[in-house]
Amino acid sequence: MPSIHVEHWGAGPPVLLVHGSVTGGAMTWDAQRPLAQHWHLIVVDRRGYFPNPPAEVEDFEVDAGDVAELLTEPMHLVGHSYGGVVALLAAAQRPGMVRSLTVNEPPAFGLLPDDPIVRDYARGLRELWDQGPADPTAFLHAFIGYVGSAVTPPNPLPPALLQNAQILRHERLTDEARIPLGVLRETPFPKLVVSGGHSPVFDAVCDVLERELEAQRAVVPGAGHSVQRTGAPYNEVLHRFLAAAR
């Protein structure tokens, strides 16, 4: 088992929640706590994210291996943003342990290398990493603005969020991720792709996943990229999907 922090909320069929960039598990999925009335929510903190020890780099392939190891029994897998890419990779590694797969706006930009809007967006993100502020707080604000996140970080950053901002600066960018669409397409478990209806870039990525994986598709507006922060609207979509996938 990977030596990363995991919290357990509620009881019921297991649902493994994988956070994205900036915020760790509990902060990312706080609005999903009501679902613990029906589900055993397994909330992971990826490597380098508080309260785990600091790490030198954030890598979706390493994280996918960690998440795959946590799939010790059949469970539902849910990933947000960077964690959505992680979840896609992990599900392909251990498909027999996945009851269903849900991803929220995964930045799998490599799926659309010839789409000019997606390509320009990914290039701009890489320029932010190459030329953006060295100060973690300033970089965090620039990143949040770029991706359209609903997160508003406090000023000054508390130690936990500062640690997360520091690992963000050393994140392996997801345009390098190679999503195994063929493997995932052949898996029997149902898939759900969720977007926030705020970005043609993320909509395009989600549309490709819907088509290639024969996935269900949902749009939950109101919180930009941070779709799960809408609370009840997102929870209703997720609960209905999970219940049907039992």
Regions found by a protein language model. Name each.
Residues 156-222:
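Conserved serine/cysteine hydrolase catalytic core
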Residues 45-49, 107, 221-223:
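Short beta-to-alpha linker loops that shape the active-site pocket of alpha/beta-hydrolase fold enzymes
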Residues 213-246:
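Catalytic active-site module of serine/aspartate enzymes centered on a nucleophile-bearing elbow/loop
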Residues 42-78:
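Active-site loop/oxyanion-hole signature of alpha/beta-hydrolase fold enzymes
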Residues 17-21, 81, 196:
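Glycine-rich His-Gly loop
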Residues 106-158:
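Helix-rich cap/lid subdomain of alpha/beta-hydrolase
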Residues 1-53:
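Conserved HGGG/HGGXW glycine-rich cap/lid loop of the alpha/beta-hydrolase fold
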Residues 74-112:
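Conserved hydrolase catalytic core segment
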